[in-house]
Amino acid sequence: MIHQNTIYTTGIETEEQVRQLTERISSMIGVHQVNINIIDGQVTVSYETPANLNSIEKEIYDEGYKIVF
């Protein structure tokens, strides 16, 4: 089953940061699509097992961005 979640973040400001984060998340097994909106601070991810929301949020955090709840 494919899930889609939008994660709100802060700190993503450049196209290079978007490219790096997109590559990092896309390399996760189970991730199908990543869309990042700099203006709204949204990272929308389509994924299935073994990827999960917690592991995706951890990748964003490990890349240096904050998750906003």
Model-identified regions with their sequence ranges:
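Compositionally biased, disordered extreme N-termini, encompassing classical targeting presequences
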Residues: M1-T6
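Short, surface-exposed ligand-recognition loops at beta-strand->loop->(often short) alpha-helix junctions
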Residues: I7-Q17
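Short amphipathic alpha-helices in soluble, non-transmembrane regions
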Residues: Q20-I25, S55-E63
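Short acidic amphipathic segments
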Residues: T22-N37
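A generic structural motif
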Residues: G41-S46
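Helix N-cap motif at beta-to-alpha junctions
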Residues: E48-L53
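Conserved short beta-strand edge segments in small beta-sheet-based binding/regulatory domains
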Residues: G64-F69
